[in-house]
Amino acid sequence: MLKRTTKIAFLSSFVALSAFSVSAEDMQFGVTPPQITAQTYVLMDYNSGAILTALNPDQRQYPASLTKMMTSYVVGVALKQGKIHNTDMVTIGESAWGRNFPDSSKMFLDLNTQVSVADLNRGVIVVSGNDATVALAEHISGNVPNFVETMNKYVQQFGLKNTNFTTPHGLDDPNQYSSARDMAIIGAHIIRDLPEEYKIYSEKNFTFNKIKQANRNGLLWDKTINVDGMKTGHTSQAGYNLVASATTSNNMRLISVVMGVPTYKGREVESKKLLQWGFANFETFKTLEAGKEISEQRVYYGDKNSVKLGALMDHFITIPKGKQSEVKARYELADKNLQAPLVKGQVIGKVVYQLDGKDIASANLQVMNDVGEAGIFGKLWDWLVLTVKGLFS
């Protein structure tokens, strides 16, 4: 594999989530994380995907109402694709009747009434209504099992290794589980893919049928940290769970997940500790700009002699504060002799980022333009060039 060290201009602006390979639990760089009381937790940077600190991040837990984040994702996609509309009126059937969910969170749906998709969606996100999840599941997919199947299709699509859903609401089931890492990834997808859906997560209250209920995410009221959403969950077996996301004035966004916290208030305290620690000790910056060339490479057997290399997506890394000038980058090609045909977006190597002598992240290196095949004489010439080159390598 060809390795080349190259100077890459690091940019300071921030945009959408990017896919990065990061060295997970080793991301602390000697920065001592806070003491967190939870069975499992994760702190992830939204833009880079870096895990800044974690405890048992892949341990399977009962998600409780964190399940509703995936329910919300399915609903948001259906709205975005025009399969359903906020103004659609949904008739509440027997299975979605609020009376079927005693001693659990609900929006108090009455049998045979009609409720808009917009209200039901808020019932899911803001007040964690179990009845609302069933009503939306039946409206979108015809029945709950079909809806759950769609939820699990997204589990596969997102590459989640420790998640399986059996309900849209999250009440405990032996075959329903998720992990802190997987919930952070689901949260990032909601923020990135469905910005209109994510806006609802910041709403502090929801009134339906003259019943006003508050969002259970108490961090939305905390003026010392800019939390703008995500979801709580609790059952006796799950303990207290919370996914929270917050931003800073320079557009850094973190996602925290705590699961299995012993107390209601504790999940907010532990989440806040994680978020404040992350913002105090780390910074995220853009390393590759979408569509911008970072290098040019010789191509053989092509109708062009060279091809531009770069990335089709913005890419970011997260490092300890004050370390940006110490980051080094190199690019590695899978094959030192690139051969046509090449297609725009084709991955031909990677850019590797290093700090303090350790590889900390990598991004796909892609072809920035198509390269077709050369004619017979061009191919013959390049064959001769490579043959001679091989004799001296």
Swiss-Prot record:
Species assigned in the record: Haemophilus influenzae (strain ATCC 51907 / DSM 11121 / KW20 / Rd)
Record keywords, A-Z? Carboxypeptidase, Cell inner membrane, Cell membrane, Cell shape, Cell wall biogenesis/degradation, Hydrolase, Membrane, Peptidoglycan synthesis, Protease, Signal
Sequence positions that bind substrate? K231
Note the Pfam families from the entry. PBP5_C (PF07943), Peptidase_S11 (PF00768)
Gene for this protein? dacA
- Gene3D superfamilies annotated for this entry? D-Ala-D-Ala carboxypeptidase, C-terminal domain, DD-peptidase/beta-lactamase superfamily
InterPro entries tied to this protein: Beta-lactam/transpept-like, Peniciliin-bd_prot_C_sf, Peptidase_S11, Peptidase_S11_C, Peptidase_S11_C_sf, Peptidase_S11_N
Q: What is this protein called?
A: D-alanyl-D-alanine carboxypeptidase DacA
Spell out the family assignment given in the record's similarity comment: Belongs to the peptidase S11 family.
